[in-house]
Amino acid sequence: MEPLRVMRIIARMNVGGPALQAVTLMRGLPADQFEQRLYTGFVGPDEADYIDLRAPGLAVHRVPRLGRRIGLADDARALAVLATEMRRFRPHIVHTHTAKAGTLGRAAAILARVPGRVHTFHGHLLHGYFTPRTARLVAASESMLARHTDRLVTVGAQVRDDLLGAGIGKPGQYTVVPPGARLGPLPGNRAARRELGLPQAGPVVAYVGRLTRVKRPDRLIAVARDVIGAVPDATVVVCGDGDLAREVSRAQAGLDPSLRLLGWRADVETVYAAADLILLTSDNEGMPVSLIEAGLAGLPVVATAVGSVAEVVEDGRTGLLAPCDAGLLARCVVRLLRDDGLRHRLGASAAARCRERFGPERLVLDVQRLYEGLAVQHGWWPECWLLGATSPVPDSQHPADRVPR
């Protein structure tokens, strides 16, 4: 039985959930069953490349014009390169990740007549990114592309429901595959704080993620200001970068030394080890890997209740969720900083939940089953191959969450 050839396309490998998931699949799917190639562009000047930081040995095919920037001429060239590579590689399946790669990659797959097409929504662009008019155009484009896609994968059930509500795809096309993550060994708290130059005494609140508009770094600063005012010995650390990093740096002047900017770090485990809780302030999310990593590190989370965040963070059990309001978020943070017992209980529950549900092995198995279902459907593999296959989300009652047999 010949291995399935899978061409994986992602616009850029900037540090974040999509890059982590792509690397996990490239490394985790069995090589005797899947021949994979990863195609990606380059990160922007304000971004760190996940390949450089966490996966330097991974083979990557670079497509220069496939990055973040949108431009008709560059996108047309990237489309042509992808279609040419597909004709050479002759993949059974093209699997695209993120919006731009999903558009160009699926268009190229149609041109190159690739039979199997899969797209993963690691979130969506329906709100928080564009004007309402542009968001409607994005939804119309995604709806059209969905008609030419075999399987639509979402990282959470809420993301799926939002997309269906916008008229994108049909329920039977969808499969929910939550992210999978693993942390390396965590240093001790004192050693981690010493490495980061943080005070040994006092609580530490950490933000791990991009500094872009949808993540609302302005709200992050407002929360930090309120928390530091209420808990004067608290330190807020920001691990990340982005196009709004300069604005955050300017705001730091009024909060220094209680607000620390770390930039991107390859040793994110050090940040989690130094922290007492993790903060997320976004207007829109898929299923943030930083919250899964926080749970794996035994840390509670205070987050906005957006996207599929509530599928990671159980309000009152593994963290605290709040509306998109800086004052309410700050109150949740202060509550946890002042109640050591509650904070430790939530962190222990978060660790148990994330270790059970969000491991990389489960992610790989979910996607492997999805590919196997396509292989049988298209006649590439015999149907007996699926004997014993399980649903990607076994506890879900939604029919779209089961791999079509």
Predicted regions, residues:
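Short hydrophobic beta-strand element within catalytic cores of glycosyltransferases
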Residues: 300-303, 313
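Aromatic "clamp/platform" in nucleotide-sugar-dependent glycosyltransferases that forms part
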Residues: 264, 283
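N-terminal strand-loop element at the rim of the active site
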Residues: 4, 8-16, 20-74
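A short, active-site helix/loop in glycosyltransferases that binds the activated sugar's phosphate group
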Residues: 147-173, 181
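A short helix/loop element that forms part of the nucleotide-sugar donor recognition site in Leloir-type
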Residues: 47-52, 186-199, 204, 351
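Conserved acidic donor-binding segment of nucleotide-sugar-dependent glycosyltransferases
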Residues: 315-316, 320-327, 335-341
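A short, well-ordered alpha-helix in the C-terminal region of glycosyltransferases
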Residues: 335, 342-357, 363-369
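Conserved donor-binding/catalytic core segment of Leloir-type glycosyltransferases
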Residues: 7, 199-215, 221-225
